[in-house]
Regions:
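N-terminal and secondary-structure boundary signal
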Residues: 1-274
Length: 274
């Protein structure tokens, strides 16, 4: 959405203070661990843009809280699997040989939104080591969340998603829906269903003096039914844990990650049957 259209739909600009108040009303409290998926344009016009949104989140969480965001870089993946857009097969060996290695400081996010990309570059933010599905975190639990992110099965048991689960963290959908809810991928890794596939992935990683193309196993993830899962979760008995409200102009949801992951695992085993 263009900035002009955002201005047109906004009656009063959002500020750090107004966003913090909205977050508090939604249920964000000091000391929480919160994984945020976000859309800046959904919030309306914000004084200070993405920097102000992050400031509001950090103020709402306080010094004891930990803010987490996805920092994925899907362009550092096996090129034979690219679809949006695909590239010629003759390019694949060139990409594998020459794609720059993942660097937690330099590698930008892709398709995560400007709030997540801004957060990645801020002082004090830690980023996990996975070349494709890294996460960034800031706060007392940041090291625990981002350390020891395994290369294989990058959104499974040895991932930041699993550490957030261990910490009884929360998911905040800030103007986005469950199609963006990466915690459901943790459920994909844990659940057993007939269509589940393990694939060979690849990515460029740094070595002591250069880089190499590493290959590793991963679950062939699929988010196409995540919105349906989210709607079923809201309608279920488990859905009472979801807090819904407005932050700026955005429809938002705050929920315990464990409840979402556990429900999603059961849903996948029941519904992904063919």
């Amino acid at each position: 959405m263009s900035e002009g259209k955002i201005v047109q739909k906004t009656e009063v600009p959002a500020t750090v203070e107004s966003l913090q108040a909205d977050l508090h009303a939604l249920g964000v409290k000091p000391g929480m661990v919160v994984l945020v998926h976000s859309s800046l344009s959904a919030l309306g016009w914000v004084c200070g843009g993405s920097v102000a949104v992050i400031a509001a989140l950090q103020k709402a969480l306080g010094s004891a809280g930990t803010l987490v965001m996805p920092a994925h870089s899907p362009d550092l993946t096996e090129p034979s699997g690219w679809e949006s857009p695909p590239v010629p097969e003759s390019w694949w060996p060139v990409i594998r040989e020459h794609m720059l290695a993942y660097d937690p400081v330099l590698t930008p996010t892709r398709s995560m939104g400007i709030i997540a990309e801004t957060f990645r570059k801020q002082r004090g933010v830690l980023r996990s080591a996975h070349p494709q599905v890294s996460f960034c975190a800031c706060g007392p639990q940041a090291s625990r969340i981002t350390n020891n992110h395994a290369l294989a099965f990058g959104m499974g048991e040895h991932s930041p998603l699993a550490r957030i689960y261990d910490l009884h963290g929360f998911i905040l959908l800030l103007g986005v829906d469950h199609g963006n809810n990466t915690s459901m991928h943790l459920a994909e890794h844990r659940a057993t269903f007939p269509t589940k596939r393990v694939i060979q992935q690849g990515a460029p990683i740094a070595t002591a003096d250069s880089r190499r193309w590493a290959t590793f196993e991963d679950v062939d993830i699929d988010s196409s039914d995540f919105d349906r899962i989210g709607k079923d979760f809201l309608r279920s008995d488990a859905g009472h844990v979801v807090r819904r409200g407005r932050v700026g102009l955005a429809d938002c949801q705050l929920m315990p990650q464990r409840d979402v992951v556990d429900f999603t695992g059961g849903w996948l085993e029941e519904n992904r049957s063919n």
